[in-house]
Amino acid sequence: DENPRVQALAKKSRAGVIDGKPVSKNKVFQYRDAIFEAALHRFETDPTMVAYGEENRDWGGAFACYRGLTESLPYHRLFNSPISEAAIVGTACGYALEGGRALVELMYCDFMGRAGDEIFNQLAKWQSMSACILEMPVTLRVSVGSKYGAQHSQDWCALVNHIPGLKVVFP
């Protein structure tokens, strides 16, 4: 592949220890690299796939997971969105209902509340309300963690895990 990030990842170690010695953090394949590879593979195999969110194209999204995709994808498949969590998730729902597959990102888990209706009532329920005639192939990526302040460090996983129709996945 001619993608510069793919070439750089080919040189990284997929193990943290080689010959009993720890590999430098800069030389180890990271979780964000796995997200990049999985997304690139899906983009190559599914022409309906799109990805968007705040700063996804320009900065690579949260933790630079999408950095390098700009070299492989046209703007209409990977793009920046306005700062409107409800619009991000709402348009993903609409796109999925029309047969597309969306990989959308909210910068922080805390902002899921800004898209509450779209996540908890639309995204989670359309498939079951249609007796599985409609599918909702949407992946919503959010950052969960600490060190970003009181309104950027919450973990809503327990709440989301109790909503029928949603799945929570962690590395």
Residue ranges and their predicted role:
Residues 2-171:
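Thiamine diphosphate
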